[in-house]
Amino acid sequence: MRLLDALRIEAEGLVAKVQQSNLFSHMGDRGEFREQIIQQFLRPFLPPCYGLSPGEVFSSDGEQSAQVDIVIYDAVFSTVLFRSNTRMLFPAESIFGSIEVKSSLSLSELEKACGNIESIKRLTRRQADAMDLLPFVRFPLGPGLRGGGDFRNPYLGIVFGYKGATVDSVRGVLGDRLSESGVNRHCLPDFVFVADPGYMVYRRQQDGTPAYPGGDFSTYGWIPTGADNLALLFLTLNSCLGNLRLRRPDVNALWIQVFRECCQQAGWMVT
């Protein structure tokens, strides 16, 4: 298939770019360069409606995430703050998820990545379902008709490492977090990809099949990916994004709030 061929060819070209990043002596510069490599790999294959940028995410109740390597956001319909800057600020309602990029995914770096992903996944927002055709368009149902009710806007959380720890140790860290008392399992990463030695870790349901983001899962499974690690990263991302929906905040309620505040500040009666 031509798409898969193109993905594999593009992935092969990333090896030279990763080697170029080794010319940076400052680890922060090297890490930022490698984040851009992943963006440059994904960008040509993703529709323009999906934006990719580093930044932070905030919710309507005042909570805010950590700084995230790559935020996947709605680049067409949703509000984004400081869009012209290299790092943006995103309302929780405007994003699909995030990718944490690590040059070397040690266990300590995995813990940090889990923390960053959790800082997004714990942000509250209105639930979207199949009736949300666009962030601001909801399919109307007539009297007596029912629809929707499914959960279509979980936050997607992916960790990618160019090199990394063994798959058993990565699964061990995730398994320990999964078994901790009081932990919200849905705040854990959905997928972990490591290009060298080449594997994917995924949420696994009780019947052994992969779980979609937001779905129930019992443990973490894995498969060896070999040279197809980056190709599988893109295909996984594309498959998940195709099932997600967004729902904008209640702008009408915000309008009424600001309208009333303006009237009150002017000393006018508000009915």
Give the predicted meaning of each segment.
Residues 1-67, 72-271:
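Intrinsically disordered, low-complexity Ser/Thr/Pro/Gly-rich regulatory segments
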